[in-house]
Swiss-Prot record:
Belongs to the PurK/PurT family. One of its GO terms (molecular function) is phosphoribosylglycinamide formyltransferase activity. Mg(2+) binds at residues 273, 285. Pfam families: ATP-grasp, PurT_C, RS_preATP-grasp-like. N(1)-(5-phospho-beta-D-ribosyl)glycinamide binds at residues 21-22, 81, 292, 361, 368-369. The keyword NAD does not apply. This is Formate-dependent phosphoribosylglycinamide formyltransferase. InterPro entries: ATP-grasp, ATP-grasp_carboxylate-amine, ATP_grasp_subdomain_1, CbamoylP_synth_lsu-like_ATP-bd, PreATP-grasp_dom_sf, PurT, PurT/PurK_preATP-grasp, PurT_C. Keywords: ATP-binding, Ligase, Magnesium, Metal-binding, Nucleotide-binding, Purine biosynthesis. One of its GO terms (cellular component) is cytosol. Pathway: Purine metabolism; IMP biosynthesis via de novo pathway; N(2)-formyl-N(1)-(5-phospho-D-ribosyl)glycinamide from N(1)-(5-phospho-D-ribosyl)glycinamide (formate route): step 1/1. It catalyses: N(1)-(5-phospho-beta-D-ribosyl)glycinamide + formate + ATP = N(2)-formyl-N(1)-(5-phospho-beta-D-ribosyl)glycinamide + ADP + phosphate + H(+). Homodimer.
Length: 399
């Protein structure tokens, strides 16, 4: 493996499709390894735009615009960091030999919506999941619930991110509202939802799974320690590592994650979401990229999920070792405003073993994730207390 010099004829060029806070960290990790990075997003001054060598603003669901940009920039690798991408065009780009898609164009296409990956996991691989059906109309949704899914259940757009459009239904009175909310929350392909039966789980985890080359050049699967997390409305608000699990549950979680990521193939880090009850484990979702709950790895592992993704992408060896217990807590914008400021940083960073990441998003919304606090501790409980305390000290303000 050779890496050249950025901004020179020898440069290794990587294009990130999606330049949010997770993409920003991947860009920084790639640049530390001498890679020339092109960041692409749908709006100007996205977090990753602020640190990349070059930045572009396009609609990534526009296949023609995407191909034109790839032909212009000539990246060696394309790294999708979001779901809303013209994945059919990625398949064409890869088939034409214009660039290698990470982990593969097929993986990007399958995981761009919940239908593709759920059918792969449950119907092709036979992995345990919640009971589910897909619906294209309010009537189909009601029929799916009445036909066996039952209440309580969860309705999600087949394509959305960060919990957008997701609802918990406790009875018939919730169906219309959930359908309307899902239609407004989906990124594309609006009007199709997945309805899932509720699993009585003890906790949910993200198992960061890395497919990387070893010193012999073979792709090997590695696992990080499990990450526990709390979600509100489908959106992560805090995470911690490690999450205590029984040996049997951990082994089953790793088996499920290996089966899914092995089928998707390629190189890179995958965020595999799982439900756990005792020794039983159910597959929920997978993202072929760093996961928001994995922000905790900025303080808990020797190499963060972003550094692991960068190394795996480049065909380099990885080390998934846990360094010490850590936790993360989200900092919300709290207001509808452009160009907000943040106060209370002195108090936040006075919390023992704490650190902050302010993402630099150009516009704040009340529940938009604008930053994260991370902290270490003697235990995950202590780390969680510190991370939440540090996050609570940060006060978004109008300038």
């Amino acid at each position: 493996m050779k890496i050249g010099t950025p901004l020179s004829p020898s440069a290794l060029r990587v294009m990130l499709l999606g330049a949010g806070e997770l993409g920003k960290e991947v860009i920084i990790a790639l640049q530390r390894l001498g890679v020339e990075v092109i960041a692409v997003d749908r709006y100007e001054n996205a977090p990753g735009h602020q640190v990349a060598h070059r930045a572009h603003v396009i609609s990534m669901t526009d296949g023609a615009a995407l191909r034109q940009l790839v032909e212009q920039e000539k990246p060696h690798l394309i790294v999708p960091e979001i779901e809303a991408i013209a994945t059919d065009m990625l398949v064409e780009i890869e088939a034409a030999g214009l660039a290698e898609v990470i982990p593969t164009a097929r993986a990007a296409k399958l995981t761009m919506n919940r239908e593709g990956i759920r059918r792969l996991a449950a119907e092709e691989l036979g992995l345990p999941t919640s009971p589910y059906k897909f619906a294209d109309s309010l009537a189909e949704l009601q029929a799916a619930i009445d036909g066996g899914i039952g209440y309580p259940c969860i309705v999600k757009p087949t394509m959305s991110s960060s919990g957008k459009g997701q609802s918990l239904l406790r009875g018939p009175d919730d169906v219309q509202k959930a359908w309307d909310y899902a239609a407004s929350g989906g990124r594309v392909n609006q009007g199709r939802v997945i309805v899932e039966g509720f699993i009585d789980f003890d906790y949910e985890i993200t198992l960061l799974t890395v497919r990387a080359r070893d010193t012999a050049g073979e792709v090997v699967t590695h696992f990080c320690e499990p990450i526990g997390h709390v979600q509100v409305g489908g959106d992560y608000v805090e995470s911690w590592q490690p999450q205590a699990m029984s040996p049997a549950a951990l082994q089953r979680a790793q088996e499920i994650a290996a089966a899914v990521t092995g089928n998707l193939g390629g190189r890179g880090l995958f965020g595999v979401e799982l439900f756990v009850k005792g020794d039983m484990v159910w597959f929920s979702e997978v993202s072929p990229r760093p996961h928001d709950t994995g922000l905790v790895t900025l303080c808990s592992q020797r190499f963060s999920e972003f550094e692991l993704h960068a190394r795996a992408i480049l065909g380099l060896p990885v080390d998934t070792a846990l360094r010490e217990a850590g936790a993360s807590a989200v900092i919300y914008g709290g207001m509808e405003e452009k160009g907000i400021a943040f106060a209370g940083l002195e108090e936040a960073l006075a919390v023992p073993r704490s650190d902050l990441r302010l993402f630099g998003k150009p516009e704040s919304f009340k529940k938009r994730r604008m930053g994260v606090a991370v902290a270490n501790g003697e235990s995950t409980d202590q780390a969680r207390e510190r991370a939440k305390l540090a996050a609570s000290k940060v006060r978004p303000t109008r300038t």
